[in-house]
Regions:
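N-terminal leader/targeting segments
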Residues: 1-76, 184, 280, 479
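Hydrophobic alpha-helical transmembrane segments in multi-pass membrane proteins
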Residues: 2, 22, 36-37, 53-55, ...
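Membrane-interface helix/helix-cap signal primarily in integral membrane proteins
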Residues: 57-230, 550-557, 563, 597-599, ...
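Aromatic-rich juxtamembrane segments at the membrane interface
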Residues: 157-290, 518, 566, 591, ...
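Core dinuclear metal-dependent hydrolase active-site scaffold
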Residues: 212, 312-320, 448-566, 612-683, ...
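Metallo-beta-lactamase
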Residues: 564-575, 597, 684-688
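Active-site HxH/HxHxD metal-binding segment of metal-dependent hydrolases
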Residues: 574-611, 705
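Cap/insert and terminal regions of metallo-dependent hydrolase folds
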Residues: 591, 671-743
């Protein structure tokens, strides 16, 4: 089996080289590799022959990458940006998005077919797996997104996205064996919603099907912070539990388990959308179960490499998928290091005594110890990827996995059987679902409690926290490679001490200057953080929905700020306040300042209710206010019906003043200037994200800013900032700093 390992490894290396280095390499390189491969095979030495197998994998990988691009990607390049009529077949049920709905479909256009995602607002019928779809849409290719740095679609084998122009027409489709997994998934979703209580149905749906639409943003974020998000993203864990359950039902008969389990696992993987981690686990488990049947020994490196070969043969660009990278990195760490770590820990005198008896307590302890060893081992290769991709390292992960993973195994098996039972006997399934909901609630309680801890995760916002992450990685590596070199309690104490020191340095670095002002990168929105002395203020908190509130919370927590003195909302547009609820969940806010003249709307009502629930004092601003740290809040000068009416804020510092005008229009700026004697402000936050109707010449002349900050999303659909605004700022002689170009902007003084 090692030859398969060498060939698969060479194939994977070739795919990585092609995607990152040799994409435009000439064909002569393939010819040279072919010549080297042939020469090596002519030599009879075993070591050379093995090298030849690896080179053959390299040759096959490079040739397949080039052929795949020519066969499946280039035929669609000419369609990018065009609007055309199409026909398609739905591959799954539609999902809600921020701007409407989307559905995965097999799209046919000019005689060419490919997997695509259709975005639409309205349809003339119900969409089910197999439904025939037609309409007119603007097309965007995966290559165009790849050129802009977005590899998500390409890594999933989605070659086109189509934004419908007008209604999407639907017709009932014909049932087919190919769509049976998707149709069963839809029936299971309905069964889960019918059988399980509303507070646990979303979690069960995510655990069994990988469909996280029933989970709130808050729960998904808590799962990520607690380091157990993999539980609701169908992965190798789910496939392993499924096959383990089938093996148990087969009484340990490996032949029968292989005969029943492999088709069941394949069906489950397709039903859940064939995520890379599940496919990887399916291939690995198939090799493990089949190895004894063909009189071969299981070889972990071979199973890992073979699984990667299957995925890359299907789509070489899958290597760009973060889920695939994390799945293989975690699995490699567990395969190579978990066993040795478990043996080392189980040799501890106290643990060995507890593990020796064969009873329920020792079985539970073994499961928890296994979870701990797997969690630490998985970090060896996965932690750098997590840190680079997400900028977060969960410190709570080892503890949460120990406490919750064994319960999730029970919940997965019970939930799957209950959902299947609900298809036939809903009443009986309801009783099982009620009982199964209690361990689900316990898991969620553990996750939410862990996520609320002040240091549940490291947010890699500065060099101190990056240093802590590097130390933790080195410690995990040491425990995995040489488990007997250091005692576990010593490693835990060192981790706590170093993390605490780095957090202390991070807090001191933020607190040392007299004042600090930051414009956070929240996309197309605005969130500003101002600190003067010990007083911390957040002005607006909106952008990419709840993510803007989480961005603000992580910025504050990384600097040791767990309490905000005041949150000031200039107005109630979503891009200035839709992250408030998440911010209130993550940090304590003492006082909320809002404009009195804001017209009633649903978002305003929800935010005020959330603030009241969080114990935050609410103050409606009807007159100008001067706060103890010198910050001034200017009340609205217009009526409630005027668009973009709201508060203005002037943050006063020893070295500079900063003026923030929210979304004030040019007319509102004139009224502000006529009713207030504004000082010269070194920094001006451009109104309305740099829109043409804000940041007027009159305001620029009065304030005389040295720098203008613009909070704006990259490639936003509003074309902010406007060219006219940039010309006015340049004419005023001020420098421009934009979050879409520079990320988070910080001024220290």
């Amino acid at each position: 089996m090692r030859r398969l390992c060498l060939f698969s490894g060479g194939f994977a290396i070739a795919a990585a080289l092609y995607l990152f280095l040799l994409h435009d390499a000439p064909g002569v390189l393939l010819a040279a590799l072919a010549a080297v491969c042939a020469l090596l095979f002519l030599l009879r030495r075993p070591l050379v022959r093995r090298a030849a197998v690896c080179v053959l994998g390299l040759l096959a990988g490079l040739a397949w990458c080039r052929g795949y691009e020519a066969l499946f990607l280039r035929p669609f390049e000419a369609l990018s940006g065009k609007t055309a009529a199409f026909s398609a077949q739905a591959l799954a049920a539609p999902q809600e998005t921020s701007y409407g709905r989307s559905v995965s479909a097999r799209l046919t256009l000019d005689g060419k077919s490919c997997t695509a995602v259709l975005y639409f607002d309205e349809t003339d019928g119900e969409i089910l797996p197999g439904s025939r779809l037609s309409g007119t849409a603007k097309l965007t290719t995966a290559q165009e997104k790849h050129a802009r740095g977005n590899d998500y679609d390409l890594s999933r084998g989605v070659f086109l996205t189509a934004s419908c122009r007008g209604p999407l027409h639907t017709e009932p489709g014909q049932a087919s064996v190919r769509l049976a997994p998707a149709m069963l998934a839809e029936r299971l979703r309905a069964a889960i919603r019918a059988a399980f209580p509303s507070d646990t149905a979303g979690f069960i749906q995510a655990l069994l099907l990988g469909d996280k639409t029933g989970l709130s943003y808050e729960d998904k974020n808590d799962l990520a912070i607690a380091g157990i998000y993999h539980a609701v993203a169908v992965s190798g864990m789910h496939v392993s539990i499924l096959l383990g359950m089938i093996l148990l039902l087969c009484g340990g008969n490996h032949r029968l388990a292989a005969a029943l389990g492999l088709p069941a696992a394949a069906f489950f993987i397709v039903m859940t959308g064939a995520p890379a981690s599940a496919v990887r686990a399916g291939v690995m488990q198939a090799l493990v179960l089949c190895a004894p049947l063909v009189r071969r020994e299981n070889d972990p490196p071979t199973t890992i490499c073979a699984a990667l070969l299957v995925l890359l043969a299907q789509n070489p660009w899958a290597l760009l998928n973060v889920g695939l990278q994390l799945s293989f990195a975690s699995t490699a760490g567990i395969v190579f290091f978990a066993g040795g770590l478990y043996r080392s820990l189980s040799e501890n005198r106290l643990l060995s005594r507890l593990l020796r008896p064969k009873n329920v307590l020792s079985s539970l302890l073994r499961a928890m110890l296994t979870a701990l060893c797997c969690t630490i081992s998985s970090m060896v290769f996965a932690l750098p990827i997590t840190a680079l991709q997400f900028g977060t390292v969960s410190l709570a992960a080892p503890v949460v996995n120990v406490l919750a993973l064994w319960m999730l195994s029970i919940v997965f098996c019970g939930g799957l059987l209950t959902a299947l039972l609900a298809l036939a006997l809903l009443a009986a399934a309801g009783v099982c679902a009620w009982a199964l909901s209690w361990p689900v609630r316990l898991v969620l309680l553990i996750v939410r409690g862990a996520a609320k801890l002040p240091f549940a995760a490291l947010y890699l916002e500065n060099g101190y926290l990056i240093a802590a992450a590097v130390f933790l990685y080195g410690l995990a590596l040491l425990l995995a490679l040489r488990p007997r070199a250091v005692r576990f309690w010593q490693a835990a104490a060192a981790a706590l001490l170093v993390t605490a020191c780095c957090m202390g340095l991070s807090c001191a670095d933020y607190a040392l200057p007299d004042s600090c002002f930051s414009m956070l990168d929240v996309g197309q929105g605005q969130c500003l953080v101002s600190r003067s002395g010990k007083s911390v203020s957040v002005i607006d908190c909106g952008g990419q929905e709840d993510a803007s509130g989480e961005t603000a919370a992580r910025f504050l927590l990384a600097r040791g700020v767990t309490q905000v003195d005041r949150l000031i909302l200039t107005h109630f547009d979503a891009d200035h306040c839709n992250g408030v609820r998440q911010l209130l969940r993550r940090v304590r806010v003492k006082t909320l300042y809002v404009p009195e003249l804001s017209p009633e709307n649903g978002l305003r009502t929800k935010l005020l209710f959330a603030a009241a629930q969080a114990g935050t004092e609410i103050r409606f601003v009807t007159d100008d206010l001067t706060l103890p740290d010198g910050m001034r809040i200017f009340a609205p000068t217009g009526s409630a019906e005027e668009p973009n009416a709201g508060l203005c804020v002037l943050a006063a510092g020893e070295k500079y003043d900063i003026l923030m005008t929210g979304d004030l229009s040019e007319q509102a700026e004139y009224r502000l200037l006529s009713t207030h004697d504004l000082p010269h402000a070194a920094v001006l936050v451009a109104g309305h994200h740099g829109a043409a109707a804000s940041t007027s010449e009159a305001l620029l002349r009065a304030v005389k800013p040295e720098a203008v900050l613009i909070s704006v999303g990259a490639d936003n659909r509003f074309s902010h900032p406007a060219d006219e605004t940039l010309r006015r700022i340049a004419k005023a002689g001020a420098a421009v700093y934009r979050t879409d170009l520079s990320g988070t902007i910080t001024i220290r003084g």
